[in-house]
């Protein structure tokens, strides 16, 4: 998975573990002067042993990535994300008053703190990363130790001190909505602990697809590999094409309509529903070129007094999720009113279910362009 602009959560979701002092830059040149190199050498007595042994699984890398403070800082500073959850809880205290709440993937414990302040009887905050230790201290510092219990471990492996909970709350969404596959953990918790008429927040999620013109960046990101200082490195181009890019873009780049490709009801869906194939039709809204498909998602809290939602779409206020860009092998020339038809298939990677396999079949039978192609993408 690529990035135009580096971010803490972005780097962690892409690289999982960055050693101290490691530079992680996409499409840029890093220059380290002699003085900085000397400073690094002098600091080599710092314990730089890997956080995870070589025999650990990809799941361990995933959880370790969320031990980094920068990831949580980025998420907390995402005003759209955090204020939406805060508004859901504070404006709908009837959902939490005297209720037992389970916070899945609690991180710093911010959602648990919101729930406790809204009158929850007790909150169980489950966090598998080292951040659980910080969450315990945060809870204690803010005077909620009698209301919030932080449990360190995987949801699938822990046992709650209670047989059931009234509410499950979680911020499980990844890039492209489903990257990292945390939703299945929420569904596991739902099936094991949530009472029959219990509340799950959020309870709906919508995944959309559109198409954009992006000639300038595709040239810089993809076509660059065809001629690198006179050498053919196009084998890397093939890999770059298969790697979705997470970034924002100007809404003026949108060429087609938007189409809903997946609607999820978190209260009722099965874990297998995270894999799906959906047809789509995108209608050109002007004459232009198309260089990429773009995916984004909306999240809904429909069990509130009044439905609350937010969007990660290009026309909405930016979030740390940005959008996911899937570049096309061939540039499409399209005229207003012409239709791109196809299907999108999304499924977890078999070896590492936190990664995503995305396949798009698409065709255009237009005035200037006739194509029928299949492209495969790997989000990791």
Where are these regions (language model features)?
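Class I SAM-binding transferase module
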Residues: 2-104, 108-380
